[in-house]
Swiss-Prot record:
Signal sequence annotation: 1-29
Organism placement in taxonomy: Eukaryota, Viridiplantae, Streptophyta, Embryophyta, Tracheophyta
Family: Belongs to the DEFL family.
Protein's organism: Arabidopsis thaliana (Mouse-ear cress)
Protein name, per record: Defensin-like protein 207
Gene Ontology biological-process entries: defense response to fungus; killing of cells of another organism
Cellular component annotations (GO), alphabetically ordered: extracellular region
Cysteine pairs bridged by disulfides in the record: 38-64, 50-75, 54-77
Length: 80
């Protein structure tokens, strides 16, 4: 029984190391680091308007999303 448990533990450890070393779980779509706010308060536009404001303020490479959030509505800019 202990021999089987050790084998399973070893295989699980190898799989974890494989996934970590090849960055299989790393997503290019991850966009959750807060960059800053943009536009007036309260922000009356849509998410598309918010993204356009963020790109105009912070430029395109760092900005990956703009979302209208909060009460009152704010335009929040995010980078990956």
């Amino acid at each position: 029984m202990a021999k089987n448990l050790n084998s399973v533990s070893f295989i699980v450890l190898l799989l974890v190391l494989l996934v970590a070393s090849t960055e299989i779980l790393k997503s290019d779509a991850a966009c959750f680091t807060f960059l800053g706010e943009c536009g007036p308060e309260p922000f009356t536009g849509s998410n598309a308007d918010c993204l356009a404001c963020c790109v105009a303020l912070y430029k395109s490479p760092p900005v990956c999303a703009g979302r209208v959030e909060g009460v009152p509505a704010h335009c929040h800019c995010y980078k990956s």
